[in-house]
A protein has these predicted regions:
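Hydrophobic alpha-helical segments
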Residues: 1-195
Length: 195
């Protein structure tokens, strides 16, 4: 169970970010930009990176939710397991290997990053902008993992599926008038979980 009384077993990140817009509105815009904005990285690749980083951090909510989003874009759940087992032996096209090695190192040992880590991505014919996109995704999900785990939000299969459906269809945009429609969204969420 979450650590705060305003949260419950079906809570997700929006139950944190939508309750404090002055703090979290910029993060929502950043999320939309890095996960759905222009990039050499496809949406499914970005979602797989998010799930991978989250799995490395053992954040059950973010792993489950972003794997569910990746599944909506036809990414197999087995692929995440393969990447966690051995990036180079996974069924992913090898051109992606340097990206996942970089994500692994930036997540597990960030102070050890060196020029060679960037050069490996560039040698695989990815652009410098893609490296920056990757840095933003990895950094953001390290933050989100700690935000969710710090609040005690673990999620469950139904929460992950709802997140997968919502994020694959609507992305990460949050309307400026969210405070006005949040009660309606909360009722819809309750109905979804009561079914």
């Amino acid at each position: 169970m979450p650590f705060f009384t305003h949260l419950n077993q079906n809570s997700d990140i929006t139950d944190i970010t939508w309750n404090n817009r002055s703090r979290f509105a910029p993060i929502d815009k950043f999320s939309e930009n890095i996960m759905r904005g222009p990039s050499e990285l496809s949406i499914e690749t970005r979602e797989l990176i998010a799930a991978y980083v989250s799995a490395l951090n053992e954040c059950s909510f973010c792993t489950g939710a972003h794997l569910a989003v990746a599944n909506q874009f036809s990414v197999s759940s087995n692929l995440l397991d393969e990447l966690l087992e051995n990036i180079d032996n996974s069924s992913l096209d090898p051109v992606f290997n340097p990206l996942f090695h970089f994500a692994y190192k930036l997540t597990t040992n960030p102070s050890r990053m060196v020029q060679g880590d960037v050069d490996a991505i560039l040698a695989a014919k990815w652009s410098a902008q893609t490296v920056e996109d990757l840095i933003c995704i990895v950094s953001a999900f390290n933050f989100f993992n700690r935000l969710l785990d710090g609040h005690g939000i673990k999620g469950n299969e139904k929460v992950y599926q709802m997140a997968g459906e919502q994020l694959s269809q609507k992305g990460y945009k949050v309307p400026f008038f969210i405070k006005l429609i949040k009660p309606l969204i909360d009722r819809q969420k309750k109905k979804y979980f009561d079914e």
